[in-house]
Amino acid sequence: MEFLQNIKKNYDEWTRITPQGLLYDRALFWLFVILLLIGLVAVTSASIPYSSRLFNDPFYFAKRDAIYVLLSLLTCYISLQISSSQWEKWHAKIFLFSVILLLLVPFIGTSVNGAKRWISLGILNFQPAEFAKLALTCFLASYFTRRYDEVRSRHVSIFKPFIVMLVLGCFLLLQPDLGSTVVLFIIMSGMLFIVGAKILQFVGLIALGGILFVWLVLTASYRLKRFIGFLEPFKEPYGTGFQLTNSLIAFGRGEITGEGLGNSIQKLDYLPEAHTDFIMAIIGEEFGFIGILIVILLLGLLIFRAMKIGRESLMLEQRFRGFFALGIGFWIFFQGFVNLGMALGMLPTKGLTFPLVSYGGSSIIIMSATIGILLRIDHENRLFRIGQARLRDD
């Protein structure tokens, strides 16, 4: 009850202080909603054959995805109520909670396709790796705010964020989940670049990350086979290159305008994970190059808004808000880039979803939380500018 009263109090305060036209970033909100709806339509189409075969219900995954979309909107609204100062205050607790969740996975986790990465919560299999991305972004935003001058000047300070990232990464690699570990590394690297770490240190850190990545690929036979399959997918079209060859066939069939909604052939048990990791291949087949271009444009605009909000925060000397928003922007960009690159054969296949579009409750809900955070940061920036303007007028 107290929580609902706080929501009403905050809303009344916003509407009293801020003109209606300045409540929130409408462009960001509608980009978010449109991508969710595109994802719902695409998942419904892509999952019908798979749902029919497994559950004798063609809309099994579609109904679950619709529930995830509703939960995502609720999550976005709840995260919108939390001030950036609260996120900054809770950064250590959020990070610790993320570590605890990752520690629980080997003991109470649910195995899917041979990997134990999820914790069953009834209707939702929650993936702690998704929460870890948010936890790391929040933690580093607070760390860089507190140690801003130190990170820019001292040589060893750049490796402290790396150690923090490595803690989460080690737990993820036990699942195993190299893809999410790489996302954590990119979030950390992107934020270090924005903070202004010395270029030689930054390059050295990237080189260290690259060496570790190569070592992890070479020391795991299944990763090495997947990498070889990525280099020559048509050499073993029914083996290591099976997913990639069928993904490329889907894009090829779509051509410019696509085969039409529901007319995909590759989703008929030819392309594994059609409604999750390879949703963009089905969109390419059914809506063609134009459909893919529209989705990329929408996500690109959303990322641009995130970066713009981060930049405005830094210009207002609100470093935590700025680093948090920019970290989220790097996260969304890299995950979308890797998923699309994987589907197009530009990158090795990894279990990363396309933001807000692919089927996956954990990914959609956590991504929606980040949108709520961005909307809140943008709103606080607007209030801050209004306050500055009033001071100048006085």
Curated annotation (Swiss-Prot):
> Mind listing the UniProt keywords for this protein, alphabetically?
Cell cycle, Cell division, Cell inner membrane, Cell membrane, Cell shape, Cell wall biogenesis/degradation, Glycosyltransferase, Membrane, Peptidoglycan synthesis, Transferase, Transmembrane, Transmembrane helix
> Which GO CC terms are listed, alphabetically?
cell division site; plasma membrane
In this entry, the parts of the chain located on the Cytoplasmic side of the membrane are 1-27, 88-93, 142-155, 198, 299-322, 375-394
- Please name the GO terms of the biological process aspect recorded for this protein, alphabetically: cell division; cell wall organization; FtsZ-dependent cytokinesis; peptidoglycan biosynthetic process; regulation of cell shape
Where, in residue ranges, is this chain on the Periplasmic side? 49-66, 115-120, 220-277, 344-353
Its recorded reaction(s) are: [GlcNAc-(1->4)-Mur2Ac(oyl-L-Ala-gamma-D-Glu-L-Lys-D-Ala-D-Ala)](n)-di-trans,octa-cis-undecaprenyl diphosphate + beta-D-GlcNAc-(1->4)-Mur2Ac(oyl-L-Ala-gamma-D-Glu-L-Lys-D-Ala-D-Ala)-di-trans,octa-cis-undecaprenyl diphosphate = [GlcNAc-(1->4)-Mur2Ac(oyl-L-Ala-gamma-D-Glu-L-Lys-D-Ala-D-Ala)](n+1)-di-trans,octa-cis-undecaprenyl diphosphate + di-trans,octa-cis-undecaprenyl diphosphate + H(+)
The membrane topology term of the UniProt record is: Multi-pass membrane protein
- Report the EC code(s) recorded for this entry: 2.4.99.28
- Please name the pathway: Cell wall biogenesis; peptidoglycan biosynthesis
GO MF terms here are:
lipid-linked peptidoglycan transporter activity; peptidoglycan glycosyltransferase activity
Localization of this protein: Cell inner membrane
Q: What is its main location?
A: membrane
Q: Which residues cross the membrane?
A: 28-48, 67-87, 94-114, 121-141, 156-176, 177-197, 199-219, 278-298, 323-343, 354-374
- Family classification: Belongs to the SEDS family. FtsW subfamily.
**NCBIfam families assigned to the protein according to its UniProt record, in alphabetical order:** ftsW
- Protein's recorded name: Probable peptidoglycan glycosyltransferase FtsW
Query: Which organism does this record belong to?
Result: Haemophilus influenzae (strain ATCC 51907 / DSM 11121 / KW20 / Rd)
Taxonomy of origin reads: Bacteria, Pseudomonadati, Pseudomonadota, Gammaproteobacteria, Pasteurellales
